[in-house]
């Protein structure tokens, strides 16, 4: 933990390949990097527990709590219940970085972002893509997830299959 600054990791590659290219990434690099840092520390805590390394369990648990606190303080808009973008909200939900009780509201913030900013389409890159469906459906927005996955037109899953011939979906 010598590289992060006050438990925030300020560098990384970010949420690559959103619609419009990497210059349109709207999930802050520090947010995605810090979320992965939290995830990695969570894994280390589990490994230490399996190995019965009590001191390491305590260390990683304490570090995880510090990262969580810093993450929420740095990135969470408590008033609007969002981390600011579809990917940011989906990652926070997936990694358990949303304040307890706010999960449904953060999921709704994803749907609201899609509706208000992106004409009901995704605006996510590689980190959001695998998380967006569960972030919507697990927390009461299954209808929005269904609409998203069955929508047609550019920047849709149907477009990736039929027109873009995206091999990653096959």
Predicted regions mapped to residue ranges:
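Active-site core of glycosidic bond-cleaving carbohydrate-active enzymes
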Residues: 1-170
